[in-house]
Amino acid sequence: MNAMLETPELPAVFDGVKLAAVAAVLYVIVRCLNLKSPTAPPDLYFQDSGLSRFLLKSCPLLTKEYIPPLIWGKSGHIQTALYGKMGRVRSPHPYGHRKFITMSDGATSTFDLFEPLAEHCVGDDITMVICPGIANHSEKQYIRTFVDYAQKNGYRCAVLNHLGALPNIELTSPRMFTYGCTWEFGAMVNYIKKTYPLTQLVVVGFSLGGNIVCKYLGETQANQEKVLCCVSVCQGYSALRAQETFMQWDQCRRFYNFLMADNMKKIILSHRQALFGDHVKKPQSLEDTDLSRLYTATSLMQIDDNVMRKFHGYNSLKEYYEEESCMRYLHRIYVPLMLVNAADDPLVHESLLTIPKSLSEKRENVMFVLPLHGGHLGFFEGSVLFPEPLTWMDKLVVEYANAICQWERNKLQCSDTEQVEADLE
């Protein structure tokens, strides 16, 4: 009799369990997708100056909300994963010419050159010299999307193909790209300056490319000649400080580290004969045992220690990271410099962001832009689910470059006016 009385209550119990399960799933989804995170304009760090005030007036994206796709755009992991797997949506195929430069050590550097598709807003000849991210090149979708947009805004674009990154270009010396080697980028810039003597340069670097371009500009004052400005997107600033965070499981950085290391191993091993062959004159510190260690490496640090640092004769990983990071060169950059990172970038630990923040507090030419969302080189925009082909990052870089070009044009006009007035007196 008691059992019969209790039976009708069982469905209510099961309904409660189902409700709790649904609530738990929804909670996990909300947490994982970061749906409660607000949309807001990027945080800006800069000194009050004529340049910064002009940029705030001329670059609406600096003060407007960055609105990522509603469902998944507030997750830095999904933004990063989509960039890594998909690159961009409906990416165009800009037409360019591949250039080859023989380096002093016999290496063959390549870059792709794309002519502008419209007149620039100030009517000048401007070339963007672009350095992609780790193991990337001009054929990557995010680079193609950015180049196409820059061309349509009147920019000539030169895109470095990292040494060894293109699958159809063989290495011609026992060396490939490294974290901070600026030789190939410098050769591309010199080619542009020589071929287009009237052009002015806008320097752009993505991720690892951001480290390379900032290091290049800071290495010598001569490297900043004809440079209007520099933009660095999603770099980590100091490999030495980043290496410890890259081995942590927080924000899945150890997993990302493994994936990138696996990709680097594939690239290095695809050039096995050029780098490790018996006929190759290898660096003295590079031994056959290093190849066996490469097979078992599970992190970028292990690859850097066993192989990459030895291309340039560094005695230790610490020395390699100290010398190859741009952090010690940033204070030597005198042209306008915009540093962009996303607060939810799972690859760049928040402790590394103190570097650009501190720099922007000391230098009037530096602006640090930190949106809440965007992941690592994602910055997708869109209404609900599907992203737009063009990203917030693409628009911001071109908008900033346009503003700097206009700033320089205004300064030139003011100078000309003052000269005329002086002549009249």
UniProtKB/Swiss-Prot annotation:
Cytoplasmic topology ranges: 1-9
UniProt-annotated location(s): Cell projection, Cilium, Flagellum membrane; Cell membrane
Glycan-modified residues: 136
Main localization, broad class: membrane
Reaction(s) catalysed (UniProt annotation): an acetyl ester + H2O = an aliphatic alcohol + acetate + H(+); Hydrolyzes glycerol monoesters of long-chain fatty acids; a triacylglycerol + H2O = a diacylglycerol + a fatty acid + H(+); 2-(5Z,8Z,11Z,14Z-eicosatetraenoyl)-glycerol + H2O = glycerol + (5Z,8Z,11Z,14Z)-eicosatetraenoate + H(+)
GO biological process: acrosome reaction; acylglycerol catabolic process; medium-chain fatty acid biosynthetic process; medium-chain fatty acid catabolic process; negative regulation of smooth muscle cell migration; response to progesterone; response to wounding; smooth muscle cell migration
Membrane-spanning parts: 10-30
Pfam family, one: Abhydrolase_1
Keyword Cell membrane: yes
Regulation: Acylglycerol lipase activity is activated upon binding to progesterone.
Disulfide links within the chain: none
Extracellular topological domain: 31-425
Any one cellular-component term (Gene Ontology): sperm flagellum
EC number(s) per entry: 3.1.1.23, 3.1.1.6, 3.1.1.79
Tissue specificity comment: Present in sperm (at protein level).
InterPro entries to which the protein is assigned, alphabetical: AB_hydrolase_1 (IPR000073), AB_hydrolase_4_CS (IPR000952), AB_hydrolase_4_sf (IPR050960), AB_hydrolase_fold (IPR029058), ABHD4 (IPR012020)
Family to which the UniProt record says this protein belongs: Belongs to the AB hydrolase superfamily. AB hydrolase 4 family.
Functional description taken from the UniProt entry: Progesterone-dependent acylglycerol lipase that catalyzes hydrolysis of endocannabinoid arachidonoylglycerol (AG) from cell membrane. Acts as a progesterone receptor: progesterone-binding activates the acylglycerol lipase activity, mediating degradation of 1-arachidonoylglycerol (1AG) and 2-arachidonoylglycerol (2AG) to glycerol and arachidonic acid (AA). Also displays an ester hydrolase activity against acetyl ester, butanoate ester and hexadecanoate ester.
Family matches, as PANTHER family: ABHYDROLASE DOMAIN-CONTAINING PROTEIN, MONOACYLGLYCEROL LIPASE ABHD2
Protein name per the record: Monoacylglycerol lipase ABHD2
Gene: ABHD2
